[in-house]
């Protein structure tokens, strides 16, 4: 299977509608919950574990929806949205790599550290996901370590992010 190694926002939104990958029913969230504007690189054999990498970016603008409500008079991007982006990208990697059809769900993570914040005057958030383990049995599970950088400064780190691909989510 020939795969792209970068994706535009339009292609990511096509994934939200179920139009990009014919082999899977996994989807990214639609706006406004899609937390990145583009995937700049995705490879199946990158990273220190040789399991693959995904790098993505979000352009920061003062008019992004979350700055208007979190918090009034003290706008900051909620930390959970950056963490969710890391799970979104881990799930996207599983679908991109040919994981069996399924619905992606975040399963947890081993450790999360926040050492900074995203303010409206920032310019760019970059996500760097490094796959550490892929289990491809009845249930497909991807595990990754991830960093989030704002204007080239690391502010979030997550270890052992886990995403599962479920044939049905009714009993989840």
Curated annotation (Swiss-Prot):
Catalytic reaction list: a (3R)-hydroxyacyl-[ACP] = a (2E)-enoyl-[ACP] + H2O; (3R)-hydroxydecanoyl-[ACP] = (2E)-decenoyl-[ACP] + H2O; (2E)-decenoyl-[ACP] = (3Z)-decenoyl-[ACP]
Pathway named in the protein's UniProt entry: Lipid metabolism; fatty acid biosynthesis
Family matches, as InterPro entries: FabA, FabA_FabZ, HotDog_dom_sf
Active site (record annotation): 70
Places the protein is found: Cytoplasm
Oligomer status and interactors: Homodimer.
HAMAP family: FabA (MF_00405)
Protein name: 3-hydroxydecanoyl-[acyl-carrier-protein] dehydratase
């Amino acid at each position: 299977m020939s795969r792209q190694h970068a994706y535009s926002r339009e292609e990511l939104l096509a994934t939200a509608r179920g139009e990009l990958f014919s082999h899977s029913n996994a989807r990214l969230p639609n706006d406004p919950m899609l937390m990145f504007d583009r995937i700049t690189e995705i490879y199946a054999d990158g990273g220190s574990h040789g399991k693959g990498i995904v790098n993505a970016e979000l352009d920061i603008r003062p008019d992004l929806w979350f700055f208007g409500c979190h918090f009034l008079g003290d706008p900051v991007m909620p930390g959970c949205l950056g963490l969710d982006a890391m799970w979104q990208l881990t799930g996207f990697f599983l679908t991109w790599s040919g994981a069996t059809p399924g619905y992606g769900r975040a399963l947890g993570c081993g450790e999360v550290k926040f050492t900074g914040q995203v303010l409206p005057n920032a310019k760019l958030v970059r996500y760097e996901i490094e796959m550490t383990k892929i289990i491809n049995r009845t249930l497909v599970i991807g595990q990754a370590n991830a960093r989030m950088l704002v204007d080239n400064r690391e502010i979030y780190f997550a270890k052992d992010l886990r995403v599962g691909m479920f044939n049905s989510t009714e009993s989840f």
